[in-house]
Amino acid sequence: MSNTNFSTSRSSKSIPELPNLEALRSLWPPPSLNESGDTRSVWTTHTGEPVASSVLSTSGSNNFSSPLKRPAPESHDAPIGRRLMVDDPRLIKHGKYDFSRHCTDYGHSYEWPYFRSLRRESMLYHTSGSYPESQPPYSSYSTDAPHYYHAGSESSAYYDSRSRLHGIQPPPKRRTLSPPPRRLADPVVVGSSRYVEEEVYRRPPYTLASEVPSSASAYQAGYSSYPVRSSPQLSHEDTRHGIASSGSTRYPFVPANTRASHSPSLLEPYAHSLPSSVAPVGAYPEKSSYLLSNSSNDSASRKEKPKARASTPPPLNFSRASEHRNEKGERISMINPRVVLDENGISHRSRYFIMLCDNETAIAHAKKTSIWAVKKDSSKRISDAYKKASVYFIFVAQQTYNALGYAQVVSDLNSTELPFWSDSSHAGGVRIKWIKTCNLFSAEISEIVSHMDHGSEARDGMEMMYDEGSRLCTLINYAIMKRIGRDR
C-alpha cells in the first residue's frame, strides 16, 4: 500500500511514500497472552482481522483509544465531575444537604466546587422537597442534647453525625460583621452576656439633650433593660411585643432584633432628623418642641443607616456669576473659590466646550473609536486652548438635551484622520479620552444648556464658563449614579 504520486512534468518534487501497515504493525510489540480481553487497542488481538474494523466499529462509546493514552475511566469507577469524594455515599444518602450554606455569599461560594447545580446535588444526596430547604438540618445555636447510639446501630450514620457531613459541605463562615440572627424568644441565660451585646455602633437620639424626653419610645433599638416584673404583672401589650414570659431576666423583642440590624430608623423613622425636613412642624406636636431645640446645637448627631439618597447640589445662578470676587477683586469660581477666572468666566487650566450632537451614528462611532471631528467654526479656539490648558468636550443631544457624556481631548487638531461620518463642515479630527458615557435626561442639564449663551440656547462647539462646565460634569455624574442606584 503506497501513496499515489500526483507529480506532473512541471513539478520537480514528489510526495514521499508512506510505510505500509505491516511495517507499522511490526514496530509495536504483540499483546501478551495473559492480558485481559477488556483491553482495547489499535492493534487487534486477531492478526487476520483488518485494523479498520476495530477502529470504525461503533458498538461501544469507549471503543477506541490511542495506544499512547490511558482509556477513559468508566462512570462507576471514577465519577466524572466529582473531585470531592466521601468514604461511602450509601452511608449519607439519608442526610439533608444544607442548602442555606450552599448558595450563600461567602467569598468562595461562587467558585467551583461549592456552587454546583441543584439537580446534581439532589441526585447525589437523594434529597427531596423544595430548594433551598425550608429549615437547615442543624441550627447554629442548637440546644438539643446530642444523640447516642450503640455500636451496632446504623442510625448514627445519617442522623446526627456532623463530622461525616463536614466533608461535603462548605466551611461555616461568618458572612457579615453583625451578630448572628436570633430566634423569636431567646433562651434565658443567667449570669452570662451571650445574648446581650453592647451597642457600639450608635448612640441614643437623646444623648445631646439635657434629659430623656417623655415621648421617647420604651422599646428603643437594641437591648435596653427595663424593670423586671413577675408573670401576672405582664400585660397583654408586653406579650404582644415579644417579651419572654418565663425566667427572672427578660429582654424586649423588637423588629430590629430579628436580623440584628443596628438601624433605629426602622422603629423611630424621625428620631434622628428634624421634622421640618420630613413633614410640617405641627405634624408631630409631642416631638416637635424637643427636636427643634436640637437644631441650635452645633454638633449634630451621627447620621444613621439606611442612608438617604444623595441630594443634588443646589442650583447655581449663573447670571450673577461675575459678582463672585476675591480680596484682590479677581473673578473667582462659584463652585471652587480657589479657581481664579478671567472676566469671561474662563479658567486658564481647564476649559470646556459643548458638542451638540444630532447624529446617533457619530456619537456611537466616537464612543467606540475615541475620535471626534471638530467643525471649522470652533477649530481654532479648540486648538489654541489645547496648547495652554486641559480641554474637555461635553456631549449633549441637540434635540432632547440628553447628556451623552464628557471626555478630555488628548491630541491636537488634525492629528488623526477624520471619521467616516464627517463632511466638508469639519476641519479635522481630535483624539479624546472618555470619562463618562451615558444617555440620560436631567432637567437641570437641559436648563443650563438652554440658557448658556447669555440666556439663549447653546451653539455647537461654543466654549462655556468654567462654572457651567464643571457643573455639567457633576450633574452627569449624579445622573449616572442615580440611574444605576449607587447614589446612596
UniProtKB/Swiss-Prot annotation:
Disruption phenotype: Read-through transcription of regulatory lncRNAs (long non-coding RNAs). Decreases premature pre-mRNA 3'-end formation of ssm4. Increases levels and cytoplasmic localization of mating and meiosis specific transcripts during vegetative growth. Decreases heterochromatin formation at meiotic heterochromatin islands. It holds the Pfam family YTH. One of its GO terms (cellular component) is cytoplasm. The gene is mmi1. Gene3D superfamilies: ph1033 like domains. Residues 71-80 have a biased composition (Basic and acidic residues). The keyword Ribosomal protein does not apply. This is RNA binding exosome specificity factor Mmi1. PANTHER family: YTH DOMAIN-CONTAINING FAMILY PROTEIN, YTH YT521-B HOMOLOGY DOMAIN-CONTAINING. Changing Y97A: Decreases interaction with erh1. InterPro entries: YTH_domain (IPR007275), YTH_prot (IPR045168). The modification Phosphoserine is found at S178, S230, S231, S261, S263, S265, S311. Changing F99A: Decreases interaction with erh1. GO terms for molecular function: CCR4-NOT complex binding; lncRNA binding; mRNA 3'-UTR binding; mRNA binding; N6-methyladenosine-containing RNA reader activity; pre-mRNA binding; pre-mRNA intronic binding; protein-RNA adaptor activity. Residues 350-476 form the YTH domain. Residues 95-122 are annotated as: Interaction with erh1. One of its GO terms (biological process) is regulatory ncRNA 3'-end processing. RNA-binding protein that recognizes and binds N6-methyladenosine (m6A)-containing RNAs, a modification present at internal sites of mRNAs and some non-coding RNAs. Functions alone and as part of the erh1-mmi1 complex, to recruit the CCR4-NOT complex and the NURS complex to target RNAs. Suppresses the meiotic program during vegetative growth and promotes the meiotic program during mating. Binds to DSR (determinant of selective removal) regions in meiotic mRNA, and recruits the NURS complex to targets. Transmembrane segments: none annotated. Residues 1-20, 25-80, 163-185, 225-261, 289-328 are annotated as: Disordered. Component of the erh1-mmi1 complex composed of mmi1 and erh1. Interacts (via N-terminus) with erh1 in a 2:2 stoichiometry. Interacts with rrp6. It is found in: Nucleus. Residues 289-299 have a biased composition (Low complexity).
